[in-house]
Amino acid sequence: MTESVLDYMTRLGRAAREASRVIGRASTAQKNRALLAAANALDAARAELAAANEQDLATGRANGLEPALLERLELTPARIDGMIVGLRQVAALPDPVGAIRDMSFRPSGIQVGKMRVPLGVIGIIYESRPNVTIDAASLCLKSGNATILRGGSEAIHSNRAIAACIQRGLAAAELPAAVVQVVETTDRAAVGALITMPEYVDVIVPRGGRGLIERISRDARVPVIKHLDGICHVYVSEHADLPKAQRIAFNAKTYRYGICGAMETLLVDQRVAKDFLPSMAKQFREKGVELRGCERTRAIIEAVAATEEDWSTEYLAPILSIRVVDGLDQAIEHINHFGSHHTDSIVSENLADTRQFVAQVDSASVMINTPTCFADGFEYGLGAEIGISTDKLHARGPVGLEGLTCEKYIVVGDGQLRGQATV
């Protein structure tokens, strides 16, 4: 009899729960051995990876997959190199598991502190990029978690080939195969099962489009680490160094249009707008960026009229909204109202400006004199990231190794009794 999707996912969940107890107590050396062996396996399997990826690309082309999605799907030699380097970098990172902090004596004589421990089993749901398989697996493994990976159906062959390399790494370190499992079925019911198994899965991390993340947030019976949009702003204040501001704004938008840390709205103080916007607009136009501006912006430069919807749109494309604001207070008000609480930056040489901006902007990352595209786990020194969270509970901002752990209290005594004198 054919196994149902629910039975299949339950089997994966049960195996992951059992494996989580093993990986949770594995030594740092054992986890690093698995990561380094997986890196070597990837290096040795380049031909197999390329062949599997070509199957996915051919299917994608035949099904009319958009060029942008095909580009994300492709495993170029450089991307395989990046996956190998990523595994080795994660192996080199400090292991957060078991770290104890804030041990202190209480008046009763007991000592109280906190220890970092793995979350347990993490479900990762993502779309077309097969390199996410390595990012997710490596971070979960190093942080002592078992993981169930459900990639997009368009990358199924690539993900299977990558998973085979991870399995070789686990075997080399004598760790259970179920520490990292890739969902083999492309049936969408697998996602519904994965997000409703709290007895087996401790947290879900979705990486993909807004529709996917909204569905998971709505239907999950498991905690979710997520962000919906990356509506990021750069505010050029009246105290900005304008040449520096132009470099920052240009990099924030054009470094990569498709990342969640790309600037989508440029806010400019009215006192510097006439000096700043003409040369800024010229540079953006030469790069092919479409400009959409408010009335005050369009009185200074040529731009398409911005609508109310533009202020809350994540373009992920060479399109930029520009608004001239009265000053710092209005810039902060705009960001907190229209933004997605992801990453926002101020360009200013005035300390009072920057302090107010950092204190009042309600975002996971708040930046000073630097482009928003720096919102990245690698740039923050976290190594690879499993995603960026705009939630306020548990993890916020780029989620690296520490974000995949939690803390438990450690209490040490020497015979003290509550409410009684120690004998």
Curated annotation (Swiss-Prot):
Catalytic function, reaction form: L-glutamate 5-semialdehyde + phosphate + NADP(+) = L-glutamyl 5-phosphate + NADPH + H(+)
Annotated localization: Cytoplasm
EC code: 1.2.1.41
One Pfam assignment: Aldedh
Endpoints of the signal sequence: none
Primary enzyme class: oxidoreductase
Domain of life of the organism encoding this protein: Bacteria
Keywords: Amino-acid biosynthesis, Cytoplasm, NADP, Oxidoreductase, Proline biosynthesis
Gene3D superfamilies per record: Aldehyde Dehydrogenase, Chain A, domain 1, Aldehyde Dehydrogenase, Chain A, domain 2
UniProt pathway: Amino-acid biosynthesis; L-proline biosynthesis; L-glutamate 5-semialdehyde from L-glutamate: step 2/2
GO CC, any one term: cytoplasm
GO molecular function: glutamate-5-semialdehyde dehydrogenase activity; NADP binding
Gene Ontology BP annotations: L-proline biosynthetic process
Family: Belongs to the gamma-glutamyl phosphate reductase family.
Classification via PANTHER family: DELTA-1-PYRROLINE-5-CARBOXYLATE SYNTHASE, GLUTAMATE SEMIALDEHYDE DEHYDROGENASE
Matching HAMAP family: ProA
Function: Catalyzes the NADPH-dependent reduction of L-glutamate 5-phosphate into L-glutamate 5-semialdehyde and phosphate. The product spontaneously undergoes cyclization to form 1-pyrroline-5-carboxylate.
Designated name of the protein: Gamma-glutamyl phosphate reductase
